[in-house]
């Protein structure tokens, strides 16, 4: 299903921006009602008891101690692959310790993706939902961080909504806390950590700021000694400002010093904003949060329609465009001046037959379709001062009667790992009760789904409700809620479930796998 995205407003930043019945009749009527209830609602309650898939296969499942899972991160540590999974608030029994523990961070050895081993659970904040747990997890090796112990591996995580902290996870079975980077916050979320520089963009709720979430930037090159760099947000969020408050930040993605861009996604499910920011100016420009200083590093701002959000903004740079290979602009025709120098895993923008794009994914937040639908949107940022929307994509609701299944239905998040196996070829996007969807992005102007995997519910899967507690019209259904997704450098795919179902490890099969760029796969296979 393709819905052309035509409404994007772009602002260019400027440096200086019944009757009574017999008993028998009554019972017959009651039996009919009960039977009707089962027919009407039973399917919705059990629709996902079996997995549904196309060109994807389940390798393994771990229930993550039935904790509501948010974010999986997979890191290679020597000859092992370790998964770190951040959790939403709540508490569950930890069989490894025999104690009830607040949801925090699950650590698993996924070296053998068909037999993951649960190693440790680091408890998080005791709060519920978004206010507890430890949703975010980012991992860097000391060998890449400029001032760290080269023998160590470090985990940056949120602690509920109040703090960000760093842990030593060199031995993942025995993690230890290194330091608290910042505390006293009123919210946190999905931060970004540059492993080659140590710069951390920490999604935070500073009590002095008007927005629930903005960015605190730290130099974490020496994880034991964080150095504060600056606070940053959209103009109108800062202390002392007036007027409507721009929507909260969800999370940034940085290209690091070589790419010199940071993409900030705001708004999740409404009033979305995407900022394209000059990294060098952000880090080294004037830091007092005045209007001029907040506008200074902004290259462009994309204001989405009020019903649309921006959860993830993933750059897809240097995309080959064979359709344009024969185009020959005049010698004096302006050329894109982004100045990107892409890393080894990102192809360079070399000719007119290559263009740069941003995959923007909104987040669905209401159960049973009681809100606006969120999409995957493709924005052409070849001229990043003049971004333009070129395509939108969505899962057709009728393909699975998803509005009737319970829980959320709609987009949430994409993977972020830029492994060349998938980069510029396939985009993995979670759609809650529609599971994981795989989109062929080789032609950003014509997105196509090529695979999907909807996990089966289990006895651990929690219900999702509509209506107020104790209200007569309140209804609840058990439903898969595929929350976030990530891939590792081997091409395995990890799906975290929000409704306590756990972690699913899957792989591509069939025609979809042939689109990927697996080592040793011939061009003919692709």
Predicted features by range, described:
Residues 8-10, 21-34:
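Bacterial N-terminal signal peptides that target proteins for export
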């Amino acid at each position: 299903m393709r819905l052309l995205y035509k409404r994007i407003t772009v602002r260019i930043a400027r440096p200086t921006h019944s009757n009574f019945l017999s008993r028998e009749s009554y019972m017959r009527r009651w039996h009919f009602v009960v039977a009707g209830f089962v027919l009407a609602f039973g399917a919705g309650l059990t629709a996902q008891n079996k997995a549904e898939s196309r060109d994807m296969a389940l390798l393994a499942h771990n229930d993550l101690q039935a904790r509501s899972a948010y974010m999986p991160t997979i890191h290679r540590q020597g000859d092992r692959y370790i998964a770190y999974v951040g959790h939403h608030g709540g508490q569950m029994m930890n069989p490894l310790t025999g104690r009830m523990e607040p949801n925090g961070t699950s650590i698993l050895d996924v070296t053998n993706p068909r037999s993951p081993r649960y190693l440790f659970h680091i408890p998080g904040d005791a709060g519920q939902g978004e206010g507890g747990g430890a949703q975010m997890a980012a991992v860097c090796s000391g060998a890449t961080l400029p001032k760290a112990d080269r023998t160590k591996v470090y985990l940056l995580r949120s602690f509920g909504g109040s703090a960000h902290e760093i842990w030593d996870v060199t031995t993942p079975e025995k993690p230890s806390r290194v330091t608290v980077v910042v505390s006293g916050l009123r919210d946190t979320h999905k931060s970004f950590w540059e492993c080659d520089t140590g710069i951390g963009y920490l999604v935070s709720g500073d009590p002095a700021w008007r927005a629930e979430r903005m960015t605190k930037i730290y130099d974490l090159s020496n994880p034991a000694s964080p150095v504060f760099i600056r606070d940053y947000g959209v103009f109108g969020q800062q202390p002392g400002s007036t007027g409507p408050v721009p929507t909260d930040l969800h999370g940034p993605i940085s290209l690091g010093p070589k790419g010199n861009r940071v993409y900030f996604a705001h708004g999740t499910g409404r009033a979305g904003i995407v900022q394209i920011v000059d990294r060098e100016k952000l880090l080294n420009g004037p830091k007092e949060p005045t209007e001029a200083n907040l506008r200074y590093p902004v290259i462009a701002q994309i204001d989405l329609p009020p019903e649309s959000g921006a959860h993830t903004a993933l750059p897809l740079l240097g995309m080959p465009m064979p359709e344009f290979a024969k185009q020959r602009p005049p010698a004096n025709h302006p050329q894109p001046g982004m100045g990107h120098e892409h890393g080894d895993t990102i192809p360079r923008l070399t000719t007119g037959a290559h263009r740069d794009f941003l995959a923007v994914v909104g987040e669905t937040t209401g159960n049973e379709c009681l809100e606006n639908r969120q999409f995957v949107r493709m924005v052409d940022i070849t001229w990043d001062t003049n971004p333009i929307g070129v395509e939108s994509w969505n899962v057709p609701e009728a393909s699975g009667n998803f509005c009737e299944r319970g829980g959320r239905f709609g987009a949430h998040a994409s993977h972020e790992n830029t492994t060349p196996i998938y980069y510029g070829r396939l985009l993995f996007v979670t759609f809650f009760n529609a599971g994981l969807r795989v989109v062929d992005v080789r032609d950003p102007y014509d997105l196509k789904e090529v695979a999907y995997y909807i996990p089966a519910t289990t006895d651990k899967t929690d219900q999702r409700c509509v209506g107020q507690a104790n209200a007569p019209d309140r209804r609840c259904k058990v439903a898969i809620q595929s929350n976030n997704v990530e891939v590792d450098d081997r091409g395995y795919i990890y799906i975290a479930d929000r409704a306590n179902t756990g972690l699913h490890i899957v792989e591509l099969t069939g025609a979809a796998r042939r689109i990927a760029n697996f080592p040793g796969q011939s061009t003919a296979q692709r």
